[in-house]
Amino acid sequence: MSKKDIKKVVLAYSGGLDTSIILKWLQDEYNAEVITFTADLGQGEEVEPARQKAIACGIKPENVFILDIKEEFVKDYVFPMFRANAIYEGEYLLGTSIARPLIAKKLVEIANQKGAEAVSHGATGKGNDQVRFELGALALNPDLKVIAPWREWTLNSRESLLEYAKKNGIEISQKHVDENGNPKISPYSMDANLLHISYEGLHLENPANEPEESMWLWTNSPEQAPDEAEYITIGYKNGDPISINGKELSPATLLKTLNDYGNKHGIGRVDIVENRYVGMKARGCYETPGGTIMLKAHRAIESLTLDREAAHLKDELMPRYAKLIYQGYWFSPEREMLQAAIDATQKNVEGTVRLKLYKGNVTVVGRESSKSLYDDAYSTFEKDEVYNQKDAEGFIRLNALRFIIAGKKNNKK
């Protein structure tokens, strides 16, 4: 598809400097009508100003889409991922990764509604997000062209971006320039939604540097967290959390409430070096307070209700599932296949988990379920009437048979 074939473009638009520059660049470079989409994923920033900024850039009011998709995000993306207990490379709870397929889905839906030939995003050519956005868009509508300005334009420095903005009358906030109009050192590259906030860049680019305490925007430091522990109870049904302390909550409200608990008690900070899909290593710091609590609770209720072999197989599949999400394959048949298998294990994952929150730690202190496979008649250390300990002898000997045979053979040598 050539440039002249593109009449309408749907842009993932934050209202910030970079996407405002992209908006103008699309108008000039493609001579296309731009439609903006701003997602409210619970990032904690006011999204309505994006409407006025888009209109100020010449976008028709009917072409400005601002959608509150927090409930859909948590219910249809975050919760399914947590049923899998997904963690990438042992520590990353995939807060950015899981938001991208939903944004891609909305871009495609708006493009279909408005008859657009293309969608566009502000991800750079060095990161994972370009892959996530584009795999999602192409999986849902392969006829769409995806425009990635960072891979096309010559605006390859902060100075050139600011110069372009000045030239085209794009508003530049004080966080980007000093009192003389010169570029400031860029702030951390941050991304936030209801599940997490991430930080990259600046002194974090040296993996030896400890993050500054002022960087962390959500959580108290564990040292400054309350000196008294707090206990909460999370209720589960079909593998998803449905209540806190007996009160049923919507998915987004539940996650927001867990975030509040986690922030208060300094829970959910991680500092990792991860392997990006494009091949390089990158250092990132993340705050995932509610997700950290949720993961602990979910594993606890599964420990009561999942069959042993189903649980072990699920743990074996988890790294592959997490990798698919990290690399942008949410809409792939293999992810959907794994999801179906994971969801099949969750029908009896219900009950309550009691947790102790204290200075960065989440400790499980109790769990109950009407579907529990734990039977104290068998598990007791006291006298029981149901388990004949002599049965273990044959069980052990049969499982040791290969060792016995091999040992006899080896002893003959």
Curated annotation (Swiss-Prot):
CDD domains the UniProt entry points to: ASS (cd01999)
Family matches, as SUPFAM superfamilies: Adenine nucleotide alpha hydrolases-like, Argininosuccinate synthetase, C-terminal domain
Binding, L-aspartate: 124, 128-129
Enzyme Commission number: 6.3.4.5
Top class in the EC scheme: ligase
Subcellular location as annotated: Cytoplasm
InterPro entries: Arginosuc_syn_C, Arginosuc_syn_N, Arginosuc_synth, Arginosuc_synth_CS, Arginosuc_synth_type_1_subfam, AS_cat/multimer_dom_body, Rossmann-like_a/b/a_fold
Amino-acid positions noted as binding ATP in the UniProt annotation, renumbered to this chain: 12-20, 39, 122
Cleaved signal peptide residues: none
Gene3D superfamilies in UniProt: Argininosuccinate synthetase, chain A, domain 2 (3.90.1260.10), HUPs (3.40.50.620), Single helix bin (1.20.5.470)
Keywords, in A-Z order: Amino-acid biosynthesis, Arginine biosynthesis, ATP-binding, Cytoplasm, Ligase, Nucleotide-binding
Swiss-Prot/TrEMBL catalytic activity: L-citrulline + L-aspartate + ATP = 2-(N(omega)-L-arginino)succinate + AMP + diphosphate + H(+)
Pathway: Amino-acid biosynthesis; L-arginine biosynthesis; L-arginine from L-ornithine and carbamoyl phosphate: step 2/3
Sample GO molecular function, one term: ATP binding
Disulfide bonds: none
GO biological process assignments: argininosuccinate metabolic process; L-arginine biosynthetic process; urea cycle
Oligomeric and partner information: Homotetramer.
Family membership: Belongs to the argininosuccinate synthase family. Type 1 subfamily.
Name by which UniProt lists this protein: Argininosuccinate synthase
The encoding gene: argG
